[in-house]
Amino acid sequence: MCIRDSYKLPPVSLLKQGSSLSTSKKLLQETAKDLTQLLKEHGVEAELTNVVPGPTVTRYEIELAPGVKVSKVTSLSHDIAYALATPDVRLLAPIPGRSAIGIEIPNRQRKLVSLGDVLSSSEAAKLTHPLNVGLGLDIAGKPRLLNLSELPLSLIHI
């Protein structure tokens, strides 16, 4: 009898869960309003289409009006950071696969993501391979998991 066949993983309930902080809708709306006002003040015609709060940053997605250059928004990164009183702003221009620009602004209160959060998710429950690993949460708060045996040049063999 092989040890691998008789071994059972410990229950996920033993793992610590992270804090349940969530960004308030009021704060998200205020930041969205400040952001759209700033763009308007700099002559950028754009529409806020989506707000994606994550554990450490919130992505504000905007679509530019026809004729507005993406470079006009990307050149405003320091002005956006200054206006929102944040040390850094990241711009995704464009968001891959979409005709929108993502403006990622750090949350004032960051959520601690623990391994328990990732491995107790419904996505992790669907996986049965013994070499699945929880990596963390993506910007949208969705669990990111990886099967080590599927990695190229992996030295792990079962």
Give, region by region, the residue ranges found by the protein language model.
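Conserved small/polar residues in nucleotide/adenosyl-binding loops
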Residues: 1-6, 156-158
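N-terminal "pre-motor" subdomain/linker immediately upstream of P-loop NTPase catalytic cores
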Residues: 4-152
